[in-house]
A protein has these predicted regions:
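C-terminal active-site/capping subdomain that shapes the small-molecule cofactor and substrate pocket
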Residues: 101-215
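Active-site-lining helix/loop region of Rossmann-like oxidoreductase modules
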Residues: 3, 11-136
Length: 215
């Protein structure tokens, strides 16, 4: 049997929204990812560091210079003008969470060494408020809520994506738009040590061994 194992950007999002979908039924989702260069490997990290020291260093790993820049392209462009990474977000979300969810993604590479960040905006079938979301996520395994706008408390890659398996959620907002319930969130996770594809694979194997489903 084959088991779907999402990539790092999809994994951290699904961990954060799965409890919400289970209780309030997400039917439309828009996500913008801000992906660290470590997701492209050691050569990408070296390229960023080299360009920070000398902005004239030409790009090899990326199509444009990554230092002091933001590149709205992760992976190659497909015929529909989305990148392959953006389509993976849609495909894997539908495959793992719910095939009926409409998903649109914009994947962006940012000059950060480690830690993927995501701005997620989604609609729920059931009416929901911020307290509902905070309470639900605070009780969910593997999720840490940092959300206190008055004290400027919210997760960032520098502070919260360092050798941790947890997914951090903040900037939680709810709105009623045209009588529909919408939620906005900010999600941060360590894409290398934490909720990356490699760790997911290990945890899936551990679960199968525990349940005696791996021969």
């Amino acid at each position: 049997s084959l088991i779907a194992n999402p990539n790092c950007s999809v994994s951290q999002m699904l961990i954060a929204i799965e409890p919400i979908h289970k209780k309030f039924q997400i039917d439309l989702l828009n996500i913008a990812t801000y992906q660290a260069v470590s997701g492209s490997g050691i050569d990408a990290i070296k390229e960023l560091n080299s360009q920070i020291k000398d902005v004239n260093v030409e790009p090899i790993v990326y199509p444009k210079k990554i230092a002091f820049n933001v590149i709205p392209q992760c992976d190659i462009f497909l015929d529909n003008n989305f990148t392959k990474e953006e389509m993976k977000v849609s495909w894997e979300t539908k495959k793992i969470l719910d095939p009926n969810i409409e998903v649109t993604a914009t994947c962006v590479r940012v000059p950060v060494i480690n830690g993927h960040s995501e701005a997620v905006f989604f609609r729920t079938k059931e009416t929901v408020n911020k307290d509902d979301i905070v309470d639900l996520l605070s009780e969910s395994a593997g999720i840490k809520v940092i959300d206190n706008p008055a004290d400027q408390k919210y997760p960032t890659p520098l502070e919260n994506a360092n050798d941790t398996e947890d997914v951090y959620v903040g900037r939680i907002r709810t709105q009623i738009i045209n009588e529909e319930s919408w939620v906005s969130m900010w999600i941060v996770a360590d894409n290398v040590y934490g909720k990356g594809a490699a760790l997911n694979a290990v945890q899936i194997i551990e679960m199968l061994i525990k349940e005696n489903k791996l021969c």
